[in-house]
């Protein structure tokens, strides 16, 4: 009985890794390229990407309000709820983020994002990471 359980766990673990690879390396990049093909970049659009929570962090919220008051930018937000949502809910959150990102000139985030790092950002799109961690753990846009 123990051998079967061990094999079952190993198979499930391997299937989860295959699914994760497919989602991040194939599905999300393909969806992003499709959205980019169908929509041009809006020069004044800025996307604020929050990885975990329902609202923007303090520094991002302040930047959002300052930019909103200036009236110069079209602002959008995306909340992925990373580690708090699973399956379809997370995929729907990422789809929304990708749709917004495809037309954004700039994306601002405050921590590392596995989702953003797997996407082939357009040359016109700039990623700004406000996270204060060391550079080895960051991936910046063009």
At which residue positions do the language-model features occur?
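Membrane-proximal basic amphipathic "stem/tether" segments
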Residues: 1-44
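Active-site and donor-binding regions of nucleotide-sugar-utilizing enzymes
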Residues: 45-142
């Amino acid at each position: 009985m123990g051998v079967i359980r061990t094999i079952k766990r190993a198979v499930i673990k391997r299937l989860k890794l295959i699914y994760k690879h497919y989602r991040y390396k194939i599905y999300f990049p393909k969806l992003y390229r499709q959205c980019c093909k169908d929509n041009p970049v809006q020069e004044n659009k800025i996307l604020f990407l929050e990885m975990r929570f329902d609202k923007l962090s303090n520094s991002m919220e302040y930047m959002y309000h300052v930019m909103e008051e200036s009236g110069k930018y079209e602002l959008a937000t995306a909340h992925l709820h990373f580690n708090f949502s699973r399956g379809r809910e997370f995929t729907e959150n990422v789809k929304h983020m990708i749709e917004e990102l495809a037309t954004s000139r700039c994306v601002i985030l405050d921590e590392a994002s596995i989702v953003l790092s797997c996407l082939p950002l357009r040359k016109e799109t700039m990623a700004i990471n406000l996270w204060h961690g060391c550079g080895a753990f960051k991936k910046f846009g063009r």
